[in-house]
A protein has these predicted regions:
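Structural alpha/beta surface segment adjacent to cysteine/selenocysteine redox centers
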Residues: 1-63
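C-terminal cap of thioredoxin/glutaredoxin-like
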Residues: 60-128
Length: 128
């Protein structure tokens, strides 16, 4: 059995807010699609230093997944969600000794930074 988990590791406020928007979505299947879309469009929203503008760009991606402006704004103001994300980041950093992003963990082994697809595939195939 293969289980994929996404653990946020925000390095700045833009990444934190993108993860907050992701957590606004209740449908797990759609969450991975939204996560993928956020990564694909990252260069279009993770630009500049004006967080209000960045949030509007992140929300454009959320709109594609039928998240309302009201729902996303409510989530962005929810400090519990932010605290949960940041606490998970701290725990993961300690547990897995994460020093760079992305870091992929397969059965407790770290693959950090840019991972060659062939090496990554071999590691997964060995576990299947």
């Amino acid at each position: 059995m293969v289980k994929f988990e996404h653990h946020a590791f925000p390095l700045d406020l833009a990444a934190l807010n993108a993860e907050v928007i992701l957590r606004c979505l209740n449908n797990n299947e759609k969450k991975f699609k939204l996560l993928n879309e956020l990564y694909v469009k990252q260069k279009s929203w993770a630009i500049g230093s004006d967080i209000i503008k960045i949030n509007e760009l992140i929300k454009k991606v959320g709109f594609e997944f039928n998240l309302s402006d009201e729902k996303m704004n409510t989530c962005l103001k929810d400090e519990r969600i932010q605290d949960e994300i940041l606490n998970q980041r701290i725990e993961a950093q300690k547990k897995y000794k994460i020093e760079s992003t992305p870091t992929i963990i397969i059965n407790e082994k770290n693959y950090a930074g840019k991972v060659d697809y062939k090496d990554f595939k071999k590691a997964i195939d060995k576990k299947l």
